[in-house]
Amino acid sequence: MSCYRVEGGFPVSGCIRVCGNKNAALPCIAAAVLTQEPVLLQNVPDIEDVAVMLTIFRAFGGSVERRGNHEYMLHLPQLQTCEVPCEAAQKVRASILFAGPLLARGRKAVLPPPGGDVIGRRRLDTHFLALAALGAQVRLDGVFTFSANKLVGCDVFLDEASVTATENVLMASVLAEGVTVITNAASEPHVQDLCHLLNAMGARVSGIGSNVLTIEGVSALHGTTYTLGADFMEVGSLIGLAVVTRGALTISDVNVRDLRPLGFAFKKLGVIWSEQEHAVSVSASQDLRVNYDFGGMIPKIDDGPWPAFPPDLTSIMTVVATQVEGVILIHEKMFESRMFFVDKLITMGARIILCDPHRALVSGPSALHGSDLVSPDVRAGMAMVLAACCARGVSIIRNVYQIERGYERLVERLQAIGVRIWKEG
């Protein structure tokens, strides 16, 4: 099994380009099932989850042509099967995103339970109830089987603002009869990317960026070319890396509009950056002190549906907080197992009290030391990389497949900005 060897204590420096949004690439690959014509996706990150989604797309009879480093031409002129292969589905949670497109085009979808990160209970009921509202029959018997004679638009109220459920209903409803209104829809930048792609294919989606989406069904979609937005999760990770290593870093190809929720959270830790049109620069001279709430109350960083702070970055913020003077509460509201990785930080010397599965109280700054670590999921794995980079000595990080599911050519790109990291095994 491959692992990362990281020698900590060296500041990053230079410039790094942020990759395309992983969470936009996955539903956009699924959306290519909706048309018989070619769809060219640009700025697609070269990561494991994308590779798995492309494997599933090929299983339906589709062709995938790679054009350059980050461009893929997807073409599915004839849908040969509506079954998602089991082995691939169990590698990535986003395999559930093929339910909506397969229902819309083939009137059937058969999916094994999806895999992905083990970060807590991740219910699928919202998907089932929403697709059933459009007219699908749902059967659960070891696999998930969806079928429909036709899909008819309706008012769909999601019982939670689930990103993937919103995306599934979007893709199912663009070819449905009539009008669909999704209330309590997710509005993250990657959901907006999917909406813009669908409209470029001939769909009629309005309310993009809000929590109410209106979809007027059309008879067919056509091919298009679409460029995915920047991965703001990666931007947040790289900002955190610069902070914990006391480095100066410029991150390019950034959509600065997506960083507002991140800015409020980082400022609680004394972290600021400067913004250019498509870049952010982090200075090496940061006054890393917790900004306490009025009255001297301990502040907290908590997550929620967009535009709240994204849950995928709570692990990163936990590591950053270990290097900041003061006490702060990290409250992971959405996933009850995501904070369990902090026991590894504690073995490295971090002063963290895990209050319960959702909350960690972090006191800093802590002098971390190298350790032997195992990545439990993609975001905690990247957080461990940050911890290793600021720790004294050498750290070994295992199960790096989890990290590479979400971060493109991580070792090569981090080496280019001064991180002493090597992949072994």
Swiss-Prot record:
Q: Where in the cell is it found?
A: Cytoplasm
Binding of phosphoenolpyruvate occurs at 22-23
Q: Per its record, what are the GO molecular function terms?
A: UDP-N-acetylglucosamine 1-carboxyvinyltransferase activity
Picking any one GO biological process from the record gives:
cell wall organization
* Catalysed reaction, written as an equation: phosphoenolpyruvate + UDP-N-acetyl-alpha-D-glucosamine = UDP-N-acetyl-3-O-(1-carboxyvinyl)-alpha-D-glucosamine + phosphate
Record's GO cellular component terms: cytoplasm
List UniProt keywords, sorted A-Z: Cell cycle, Cell division, Cell shape, Cell wall biogenesis/degradation, Cytoplasm, Peptidoglycan synthesis, Transferase
Q: Write down the Pfam families for this protein, in alphabetical order.
A: EPSP_synthase
Q: Where is the active site?
A: 117 (proton donor)
Q: What class of enzyme is it?
A: transferase
The keyword Thylakoid belongs to this UniProt entry's keyword annotation = no
InterPro entries (alphabetical): Enolpyruvate_Tfrase_dom, Enolpyruvate_Tfrase_sf, MurA_subfamily, RNA3'P_cycl/enolpyr_Trfase_a/b, UDP_GlcNAc_COvinyl_MurA
Q: Which CDD domains match?
A: UdpNAET
Pathway as given in its UniProt record: Cell wall biogenesis; peptidoglycan biosynthesis
Q: Where does UDP-N-acetyl-alpha-D-glucosamine bind?
A: 93, 312, 334
**Enzyme Commission (EC) number:** 2.5.1.7
> Which PANTHER family does UniProt cross-reference here?
UDP-N-ACETYLGLUCOSAMINE 1-CARBOXYVINYLTRANSFERASE
According to its UniProt entry, the function of this protein is described as: Cell wall formation. Adds enolpyruvyl to UDP-N-acetylglucosamine.
Membership in a protein family:
Belongs to the EPSP synthase family. MurA subfamily.
State what protein this is by name.
UDP-N-acetylglucosamine 1-carboxyvinyltransferase
